Amino acid sequence: MKRNKTWAWIVFAIGASYFLLPLLATIKFSLEIRKAGWTLDAYANVFADPRFQQTFGYSLLVGLCTVVVGLLIVVPAAYYVRLRAPQLRPIIEFVTLLPLIVPAIVLVFGYIRLYNSSSLLPLTNSNLGTATLLTFAYVALGLPYMYRAVDTGLRTIDVQTLTEAATIMGANQVQVITQVIFPNIIVAVLSGAFLTLAIVIGEFTIASLLNQQVFGVYMQNVGANRAYEPAALSIISFILTWGAMGMIAFLGRFAPKTAPRT
């Protein structure tokens, strides 16, 4: 028994070292911009850079729009499949998995061919149109995470009973979804939203090919032209991502644990 515990701790130490040592090395390097000693100058340079503020703010705005549009699509669809058409669930799950199967570069080239200046809907002709195209591309990219989060939330409540009770009280379908179903799955919705937001903020391929100056593109440009600031940006991105994961874990503590009644 003691030998098993010893080996377990050895494996844990090796695994932890595999992840922690590169992170610690990156942190150390980001603090060595001055040879005289450790300093936060690299982080100060990043936060003071107007391009950081612009690209991060733009990525955050696009991310929030992505979450809103994604919820407007996913929540009603998942609710309908759960309540009225459970036979469609395998098809919906397959469709939502396609963004994980199809490479992002293939996806964005398809968008460019469909919505270029010679198409019926030339979104790439204007900044607003390209930003809209980027948002919908991110909605597709976030579908696997958003749909599964919402579907998991719907599994924890009795959708049939709640819908029947709300209908008896005179609620229409929009009121049922917005005032009854949505508040009961808010924790799952927020989990999917934080995960989608974390993915969108760091995305590079789609935004780069659409010529959008987002945070991921800014990180690549800084990495190509500076030494210590890229390390600082990596740590900032790491903190943002794990902050989102921490929020998901925290919100998960408040999720309902009871299974729906049959």
Regions found by a protein language model. Name each.
Residues R3-K35, A48-R155, V180, N184-F204, ...:
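Membrane-water interface segments at the C-terminal ends of transmembrane alpha-helices
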Residues K35-A48, L210-V222:
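Short hydrophobic, aromatic-rich alpha-helical segments embedded in or entering the lipid bilayer
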Residues G153-T163:
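Left-handed beta-helix
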Residues A166:
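The alpha-helix within a helix-turn-helix
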Residues M169-G170, P183:
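Glycine/proline-centered hinge or cleavage motifs at structural transition points of membrane proteins
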Residues G252-T262:
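Short cytosolic juxtamembrane segments of multi-pass membrane proteins
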